[in-house]
Design a protein with these regions (language model features):
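Replace the tail clause
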Residues: 1-297, 301-305, 336, 445-524
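Glycine/proline-rich, flexible active-site/cofactor-binding loop segments
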Residues: 84, 103-106, 311-314, 318-321
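Tandem alpha-helical RNA-recognition repeat domains
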Residues: 88, 92, 152, 156, ...
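Glycine-rich, acidic and aromatic/proline-enriched surface loops and short helix-turn segments
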Residues: 109-116, 316-324
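Catalytic nucleophile-loop/oxyanion-hole region of alpha/beta-hydrolase
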Residues: 163, 310, 341-344
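Long, polar/charge-rich, low-hydrophobicity segments
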Residues: 176-179, 323, 328-352, 356-517
């Protein structure tokens, strides 16, 4: 057609070339493979990754920070919560107030923007504009988990309640809409509804007014920026907040508590109305890696805020993954859907789940979760570790054979498996007294040190591991009966604080204590 060969003609040519020029094709394949392989590491390793690297990473983030709207760089804007969690650590280390200012500005702006579902909660994937107003409306499980962690740590660092409330809202969404009855968490919700991007989430002012009435509807629309003109396509409005509750209450001459209660009641009524729409398609596969992130987030949520339903949900998910997505040989699978388990696990499945199990141990002090973390961490090293150059490959024994194997530490929309693994090594090393794990973390970081030192802003989760190594780190052993009031008070005192470079063990007499001794002999 139009002078171009058809598919059948191309297939015949391929068959002919394979029959008559096989060696030439194989040689070309080898040449391509050899060309690709060296690009896996663009900068040779150097010996130094230290607090100066952290300082450089902070400087790059500061330079790219959007002082007006928060976040980093120009549109489209992704949340990149590991930038924020690194800045919290750097702010604590350096006492640099602007680090915390960037975190607070970004978290506040995102919560007020259209990137956050103001009616049903949870974050959309990214913003197409600089001011967080118009999102790509898809919702991803990993964004909910990583952003919840950022808001929780910001709450621990500042004690500003609004950050805790946002984390609670994220969990409300996940536990309501993204949780399988058996305990795992679903992957995503689509952007489209009824054939229109964002159709489920946007509103006409008349629709709100007809449902809430003149006075209540007008107040709701003005607070959430819903107008006749609209701020989106075709006169629709994406709910967003331009003034804080306190400033809006002052403008309206209202008591903030009364305004908050009225808006909450109106929002609930609109949420019920929205429920009559056709819901976006749910991607109901359960991924080991992303479930690991949500287990970590819920566990940290319980530690910081003390709501037992978060710990219960994390336990249910961890038990589900360990029961359904692990083979008899102890290796993980990647995906579960409607009873079907598929694909050997990749690096991030192991690294992210180990992270979740470490946090779950520190939330519940159930030794079994620390045992599982240690075992899966060992399996991960056996399967993915690069014995020659250090670091972990994304694929390993049992995964599909590729023409090139990827080994990367870049922290993009998600932190990399290597970055998460490095911090896991450090924490498990301190929790169990295994110095070799800490050395392995240093070796991993050194293997990527050339790239890290060139562009540390691209490795902010790995920088959190560097921050841990730089110290000081706290190894806290609480001895006592977990049911005893004094023990509970000590646990709460530790968990409420922002202590990013800590590990916590609970030791008591009895079977649990003996199991902990087997993992961590120094607690005796």
């Amino acid at each position: 057609r139009m002078g171009m060969p058809g598919l059948m003609d191309i297939l015949k040519q391929i068959a002919d070339m394979w029959e008559n020029n096989r060696q030439k094709i194989l040689s070309a394949g080898d040449e391509i493979t050899n060309t690709i392989q060296p690009r896996q590491e663009l900068n040779a390793p150097v010996n130094t990754v230290n607090t100066e690297t952290l300082r450089k990473g902070y400087g790059q983030l500061k330079k790219s920070f959007d002082a007006k709207w928060g976040g980093f760089g120009a549109a489209p804007k992704f949340p990149t919560p590991h930038h924020l969690t690194f800045l919290l650590r750097w702010g604590k280390r350096s006492a640099e107030p602007f680090a915390l200012k960037m975190v607070k500005k970004t978290l506040t702006a995102m919560r007020r923007g259209g990137i956050f579902d103001q009616i049903g909660f949870g974050f959309h994937r990214y913003s197409v504009d600089a001011k967080w107003l118009v999102p790509h409306f898809e919702k991803m499980l990993y964004d909910q988990a990583l952003l919840a962690i950022a808001y929780i740590e910001a709450y621990q660092a500042t004690k500003e309640k609004k950050f805790a409330v946002t984390a609670q809202e994220i969990f409300t969404y996940v536990l309501r809409d993204m949780t399988d009855p058996n305990g795992g968490f679903y992957s995503a919700e689509d952007a489209d509804s009824e054939g229109r991007e964002g159709g489920f989430y946007v509103w006409k002012r008349k629709e709100i007014m007809d449902h809430l009435g003149e006075k209540e509807g007008d107040l709701f629309c003005r607070f959430y920026g819903i107008s006749d003109k609209g701020n989106f396509e075709e006169g629709f409005s994406i709910p967003c907040i331009s003034l804080s509750l306190e400033d809006f209450a002052k403008q309206e001459g209202m008591e903030p508590g009364k305004l908050e209660k009225d808006l909450m009641n109106s929002r609930r009524r609109i949420f019920v109305l929205r429920g009559k729409r056709i819901h976006p398609l749910k991607d109901d596969k359960i991924l080991t890696a992303w479930n690991g992130l949500m287990i970590a987030a819920l566990s940290k949520g319980y530690q910081a805020m003390g709501d037992k339903k978060y710990a219960d949900a994390a336990v249910a998910a961890a038990d589900f993954i360990l029961a359904k997505l692990r083979g008899r040989d102890g290796r993980l699978f990647r995906r579960f859907r409607h009873g079907d388990v598929a694909y050997p696990g990749y690096l991030d499945d192991y690294a992210f789940l180990v992270w979740g199990l470490i946090e779950l141990y520190e939330a519940t002090f159930e030794v079994s979760y620390l045992e599982e973390a240690v075992a899966l961490n060992k399996a991960m090293i056996d399967i993915f570790w690069d014995k020659k150059g250090g670091g972990l490959y994304f694929t390993g024994k049992g995964n599909e054979t590729l023409i090139t194997v990827s080994k990367d530490a870049y922290d993009g929309a998600l932190p990399s498996g290597n970055s998460v693994a490095a911090l896991n090594f450090l924490r498990l090393g301190r929790m169990t007294g295994n110095v070799d794990l800490e050395k392995r973390a240093e070796q991993l970081i050194r293997s990527f040190s050339g790239d890290i030192n060139v562009f540390p802003m691209g490795y902010t989760h790995l920088l959190s591991a560097v921050d841990f190594i730089a110290g000081p780190a706290q190894e806290i052993v609480i001895a006592g009966d977990p049911a005893h009031k004094a023990t509970k008070s000590m646990i709460r005192a530790v968990q409420e604080k922002f202590l990013p470079n800590k590990v916590v063990l609970l030791y008591n007499d009895g079977p649990e204590g003996k199991r902990l001794e087997a993992l961590s002999p120094f607690v005796k």
